[in-house]
Amino acid sequence: IPEHNWTRTHAGLFDVSHMGPSFFALPKGHGLEGDEAHKKVASLIERLVPADIQGLKPGQVRYTMITNEGGGVLDDLMIARPAEPGAAGDLYIVVNAGCKHQDWALIEEATKGEANLVRADDRCLLALQGPNAHVAAAAVIDPALAEMNFMTVKRYDAFGRITVTRSGYTGEDGYEILVRAENAADLANALLAHAEVKPIGLGARDSLRLEAGLCLYGHDLDPKTSPIEADLAWTIQKRRREAKDFPGAKRILREYELGAAKKRVGVRPNDRAPAREGVEIMKDGKTIGVVTSGGFSPVLNGPISMGYVEAAHSEPGHVVDLMIRGVPRSATIVPLPFVPHKYHRPKKGA
């Protein structure tokens, strides 16, 4: 809990090197330039995901999912378009640790040698998260980091050569930094020497992402659950909805138009008993859903859960029962996130 609270008020440094960072690029000598090269490489990855990757501007990052033909989710991931000269036709992709070998195989199979997937196995991924992450990053790495917008990517000649996205999975402002393994300890130690930064473990990372209402693959997302059920319709941009050309489009677009039978929601138990994954959600003695993530919220000083319920019961304010050890306990459906996001976005009119 102290680690969680420190990240919400200062800045926490996480080692997330178990994730799956990689680079996906057109073959050398592809002969394409600028937007043309980007559209080509993006069209290849769009065979797997429903997001508009061709529409990424230089330096932009997008959250998306790999979907299957049944409209379920095989993984969620970040895809970035590096802006540097010479990066035309390159994408930077970060997938989840537990799915990385499956994802890489899917990418290679779907793109059949039309582009090269290079795993960043020789690098470490560090996440610096919290309201003062920008202060430490600017002081230790480069003052320009403070000016980066949320969901953008940039490369810096510091600590070797690093790739930085202003992103993360805590609901706070922050960065994810890809650094060569031989430079990682120097970077981590330099950040930890800053008064605002402390090392944070993966237990706090999970409670932070739960407060932020963010999905954990294998729990809140799985091969049977669609992006629409998961309340992630915003990740499917208009061009892809109109083209209807991604895996699972039939089911996903039907649910997009008509609504899904179930929906991911926030659940606040009305007492102190935590409801963890697998707990049934009941209404009038009937099972209407299940908890997929649950735990204690240090910010709210009480238990919180996410889960899926029948759409008819998904509106905030609905009172439900959680079957905890065979005893029904009252809870309320609430909006997500539990704790407001504090991402760094450009000021209006700036």
Task: Give names to the regions the model predicted.
Residues 1-64, 72:
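Acidic, proline/glycine-enriched N-terminal capping motif
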Residues 10-12, 20, 62, 75, ...:
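A generic secondary-structure signal marking the coil-to-beta-strand transition
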Residues 47-109:
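Well-ordered mid-protein domain cores that form the structural environment of catalytic cofactors
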Residues 15, 76, 176:
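Acidic active-site catalytic centers that drive phospho-/nucleotidyl reactions
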Residues 81-350:
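Conserved, structured C-terminal
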